[in-house]
Amino acid sequence: RGLGDVYKRQAQGLIDADQLGWDNPAQVPLREMANVPMRHLKTMVEFELGTIAATALTVDGLKACHVGNGNKWQAIIEPSTPGFRVSVTVNNTVSTTEVSAAASPTDGVFLADYRYTVPLVLNGSELTLGTIGVGSWDEGAGGTAQGMTPTHYRIEGLENRTIEVYLAGSDSPTQITLDAKGEAMQQAGVPVGIVARIACDGTQYEIGREESSQISLRIVDGKVAFREADDKGFIPVNTIAELKMIDLDNASRGRKYLQQGNIDLLDAEWTPISKLEGIYDGSNFTVARLRVSLGNGNAGLFAANGGTIRNVVIASASALRGQWHAGMVCGENTGTIERCTNRASVTDGGSNTLGGICGYNNNGTISECLNTGTLTIDATVPSDGTGGIVGYCGKGTITGCGNTGGIGGKPSKTGGIAGQADDCQIADCYNTGDLVLPWGAGDNNGGIAGLTYNATLITRCYNTGTVTVEGSQAGGICGQLNAGATISSCYNAGKVGAKWNSGGIAGQSTDAEIIACHNDGLIESQTSGWAGAGGICGFHKGTITACYHIGQVTGDSAIGAIVGEHNSGNISYCYWNGDLEGIPAGGGGSQTGNEKFGAAWPQPSTHEAWRTTAETPAAYWRTLGSAGGGYPKLAWEK
């Protein structure tokens, strides 16, 4: 019904809102907007100002959201009375008008689920005619306004065509007609759905985008083509179809790409992009519902990377399995991966390597990446490594990365950062996730790395997660440290346990070096009899210098505050507290200057490895503490 009366308010400015009349407004049902859980009278208002080039528009003092092109604006308001105030800025001049109405619902004020389209008459030097559309929603439980932002389609090549829009899980399309620019606006439904695909003249194009978003495509001769690159040479990507285009040919794989929105892969079988040679920047938008289950070649969003992948976020995945290497971001990396995140949890049934970010880092660089997902190995074949960041690292670097996700199942060579490291540099990384592996799991598991050798260096890393395994060689930092490998300036504060050979820093060390590290965590044997459990190392055949232990060590025999068994090599200038011997008698190795806290305290003059940054900027320690004044702190440690 019409509102009947005309409400007039006078406003000052270049444009005088002399009359705002509501006379027999068209009431158009907006069922696609209904049932949004909003408070009563929370209202969406659309303003179309015709030819006036408004530079700003506010509603009740709130900045309106500019949508579309030209003069179309949209705002969400919550008036305290049945009315609202509109301010329009044109040529730096502000004009304000108020709209009010009687509070009686019989007058038809702000009826739920309806949009009111009324004429807006603006008198002044610039006369135009536009519309105000008001859509309001009934009283609900409160919450966010799902579905309020419309989907904006911009499809070059389908101008003036009608397209069919299919939501995920539905075979009933909605028809939308694009204008002469290939554009259309569609109000999103509630709850927000995923646009799975669109079709035109029988040809379908994969989308994978949430409603209430910008969906852009370029169609040439009925096929998807890349859109124009930006001023930095990056080609925009915001749909499944465009993502698949990267693997079109060698030239495509060498270009630069910029992800423009969240992409949902719809849990359909994904064929990994074979090898990126250019740059892919995910812009911290997400990729969801990744599924690679066929077990062929490498598995991941990318099969291999020889270029640069950055700012990619894997939000979820249902399967990840490769014949060789599996990683959420990529299977094998020979290039650079930086600032990427995996949140997905998966179970792998047979890949040789599995990583939260990358399966096999082959002389590549991985930096500032994070895994929060749980990785589970459910396989009867041996694994070459499972890690929160990387399964296997060979002659590469991993810096500034973290893992908070758990690792379970029956893997071997497992690490919070890297499962296996061969001549790999791991620096400034941390693990807080738990590695809890049952009977039947393999050996060599550590908070940072599982198995290391050949000039591998682990430095400035820490672990606070639990590392327990029914097998052998468990360490807070590394499970097994082999010939040529070094751990320096690291600490463990997590619980560590194994059937044999468990240590706060390393479960076993053979012809390797541990220097300037400390353990604060509980070390325990998971069996009776010979344990090989130590605060720094369980079974030792290498070199340990300037380390200390202040945690606990439990077990039947072959246990010590520094090492469980000192088979060979040298241990020097290490300290501990508690009732245990630092180094049990009977081993074949040598030792120098090892003391219990209280009997002695480390000093810079004790050994050069105990120098502090006050004397030597590159020293391992920031402070050495004192009896009753705290224990030594590493240079980087808080």
Predicted feature locations:
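Short Pro-Gly-centered beta-turn/loop motif in secreted/extracellular proteins
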Residues: 1, 72-84, 179-195, 201
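Predominantly extracellular beta-rich ligand-binding scaffolds that present long acidic/polar faces
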Residues: 220, 225-638
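Conserved "repeat-terminator" motif of extracellular CCP/Sushi domains
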Residues: 33-42, 77, 120-124, 146-149, ...
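Short helix-loop boundary/capping segments
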Residues: 22, 26-82
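A short, solvent-exposed loop/turn motif at the edges and junctions
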Residues: 8-23, 90-96, 195-212
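Short, acidic Ser/Thr/Gly-rich low-complexity loop/linker segments typical of extracellular
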Residues: 63-71, 169-183
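Short, small-residue-biased leader/transition segments that mark boundaries at the very start
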Residues: 2-7
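Structural motif
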Residues: 46-54, 150-167
